[in-house]
Amino acid sequence: MAFFITFSSCEESLDIDVRDSFACDLVLSTPEQIELLLLTTYNSTESFGAGSQFWARYMNVEIASLEARMNFNAATQAQDRFNVINGWTSSNVGQLGQKWQDLWTYVRQANVFLDLVEGSEAQINNPDEIEALKAEMRFLRANQYSKLLKFYGGVPLLTTAATLDDDFNIPRSSYQEVVDFIVSEIDDIAPLLPLTRESGEFGRATRLAALALKSRTLLYAASDLHDPSMAPQTSNLELYTYDKANKWQDAADAAKAVIDLVGDRDLISTPNAKAYQELFLSANEDILFARPFGGTIFGFGTDVTTQPDNAQSPRGFDGWSLSTPLHNYTMIYNMEDGNTTDSPSFDAANPYENREMRFYANINYQGATFRGRPIDYSISVDNTIVPDGLDSFSQDQQTLGNFRHGSTTGYAIRKFQNEALGTDVKQASPGRPYIIYRLAEIYLNYAEASFRAGDEETARKYVSRVSERALQPAITASGPELLEAIKRERRVELAFEGHNFFDERRWLNENNLGFDVKGLRWTKDLDENVSFEEFTIETRPFDQKQYYLPIPQSEINRTEALVQNEGY
């Protein structure tokens, strides 16, 4: 099986180039050399750039969520890299099919590292330093298992490197067993990790990062998708369910543990949309764990570049508009006064007036000023007289911007864009991190878990900290309306960070999993007046099997004990 493969030599097992051709025993002789081996496994964390998952790194799972659709080659709408329109099969989930191999590759690398380091000369001579490095690797392995859980449900639990004498016919562990493993690992290693890091070590594991992983894991486990009485599966329920009486209180306690370490403070203040947008462009105290960027990180080259500007800028800026936000999604953003777009304060004829701050920070809409000019998605009624908009997907504008990548929804992602780069969107943005865990998520985790545990006062307090930072009113709702307010805050605050794909699933919200994908079509008349109409771009199907990805059929065929996810 692909995820059990190992090799006979030390160098092959670690699958890296050992500097200066050191023999394995020399590599394992000092903490400094072992640290170099550890650091390559940080390539397991998410990124904006190119690597073995080219498409799945230039865009996140937002293109298969309520947030966005894929927009590559928009003139023909030929690309559906995650296969969300045709529907998933056991042999085709698009680029998501790479997840299984990529996630297991780093689990194996972690297991090999931990086995080789155990009893090494470096560990004998420097036990405390080596235990700290092992704790980092165990954190990275636990993070991989958390992703395997989200995509597949219960998976085989492998904690040592396999040898040729081992039994490869290993069944999947239950969902609850994998959750318990992650939590146990975090409880063991958190005291061994530093609380925070100096700026030169930004991006390495900390106690806060480990506890944030525990918080997310327990929140997901407690959710409706994994409740035995609500799970959509009809067989092998142990692969998908979590059945602990105090699960919501456990999730609340895990989030509170992070908050207590941070100091139970307000989030970084953002007086306007520009300040909010800049939260995502550099390291700051609200970030608990992120992947840093640069030509080299910690002295070794990485397999990524930092490309959100190129991938997500509108076409007229030579961008790809790769993940175009859905009109359905943009309507979730409130008005400036805190009312919804269903309220009288929303002007349907001027949908972008008086919206909440995060709308302007996250979304590139028609008429928004971006990199020095207004965005224009409009298509002329006669482009021989009045030209099409620079950012449209008109096939007649081949000389303007990036011809193939005009937005088909009438939107593009503004979040993560560094406008200080000017018009050269292909250059790297120095210091911009890919954020994996941050404090606002923990506050929302705490609010949701507290509500479900029966503590509405705490839920209101912490969801309001997030909404008020965005200049929205404090949340005063109670009961089901409070839970919906918490969910809305997650959809908006955590936009395009890889959460919504999983959130809607764990909430069993199928209305936001299968639906008509809406956009706004902008038209320019001969007097250059612009108008719009809402239209349906496509219908996105959803089948209950799509709560999880299929395990690659090749793995199922090889291994009798490995059970396929239901429906595939």
What are these regions (language model features)?
Residues 1-6:
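Bacterial N-terminal signal peptides
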Residues 10, 103-106, 181, 272-334, ...:
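Long, intrinsically disordered, low-complexity segments
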Residues 14-17, 149-160, 226, 453-465:
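Short, well-structured active-site flanking segments
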Residues 377, 381, 421, 440-446, ...:
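Active/binding-pocket-proximal capping segment
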Residues 11-81, 155, 187, 207-211, ...:
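An aromatic- and glycine-enriched ligand-binding surface/loop that stacks and positions planar moieties
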Residues 23, 31, 35-51, 73-152, ...:
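Conserved, well-structured interaction surfaces
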